[in-house]
Regions:
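Nucleotide-activated chemistry modules centered on ATP-dependent adenylation/adenylyltransferase
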Residues: 1-252
Length: 252
């Protein structure tokens, strides 16, 4: 078509600071011919674990020493602003992803497009995560770990030996945000033991959202599950019980 605009391809490694994206970045940097790289981007979220910032700083130092741009992009609205508008995110209304995290991605795409470029993202999904990397969400994406036939269990074994992760991968397989509504109890116990102030804050906010919804609709509600029995109050009690059991085992 005469009016069709041809965009120039650019290649950006999208890193979260979790185990897979860090391992992927190492693969990319060690194979510059196979994986051309215009820059590295980190979506800078308030809800990230403190150790993630330490990992990102290590990445940034290595990348900048190679003369490669490293961008940190924040969402245009803060987590608290969106919380005040939508309430606590849950398993159905995942604004923490679409309205928060993915806004960072949209900003990079808009910026590159304004220069006549089409962004291709390197994403840290492993070869045994087929359902995820075939998701239509990952349009214009490249998966180096898939190309290199690297399984998640191999990276998990590596991550458990990295002190910078503050024992996270000794108890968990994947890293998300501290207050994630999809988190299982194992992750919540880790949060309770290692990041208690943050855990307290997110539980308080979840309680407030549940109370508002219950008052509005006149029936019990749970952020975490479809059954309102398993609400935040129940979750807090269960996490405290499991955390005390774990501390008892550690102290034996």
């Amino acid at each position: 078509m005469k009016n069709e605009i041809t965009l120039n391809p650019t290649y950006w490694a999208s890193v979260s600071g979790g185990k897979d994206s860090w391992y992927m970045l190492n693969v990319i940097l060690n194979n510059p011919v196979k994986y051309p790289l215009n820059g590295v981007v980190y979506f800078d979220l308030e809800t990230d674990y403190p150790f993630i910032k330490d990992v990102i700083n290590l990445m940034k130092k290595r990348v900048k020493n190679l003369g490669i741009p490293f961008l940190c992009i924040k969402p245009r609205k803060t987590w608290k602003e969106l919380y005040n508008k939508f309430g606590y995110p849950n398993r159905v209304v995942k604004w923490c992803n679409y309205n928060y995290k993915l806004d960072c991605k949209a900003q990079l795409i808009e910026w590159e497009r304004s220069k006549g470029n089409q962004v291709n993202f390197y994403i840290g999904l492993c070869v045994d995560e087929e359902k995820r990397y075939k998701n239509k969400e990952y349009k214009n994406s490249i998966f180096p770990l898939v190309n290199e036939n690297i399984e998640e269990k191999y990276i998990l074994e590596w991550a458990r030996k990295q002190e910078i992760y503050n024992d996270y991968y000794k108890y968990n397989n994947r890293c998300g945000c501290i207050g994630c509504p999809m988190a299982d109890l194992k992750k919540e116990v880790y949060n309770y033991l290692y990041y208690r102030p943050q855990w307290d804050t997110y539980m308080r906010l979840a309680l407030e959202s549940e109370k508002e919804i219950e008052e509005k609709y006149g029936h019990p509600y749970s952020i975490w599950q479809g059954n309102p029995k398993y609400n935040t109050e129940y979750r807090m009690k269960r996490v405290e019980e499991l955390a005390n059991l774990l501390k008892g085992e550690i102290n034996k």
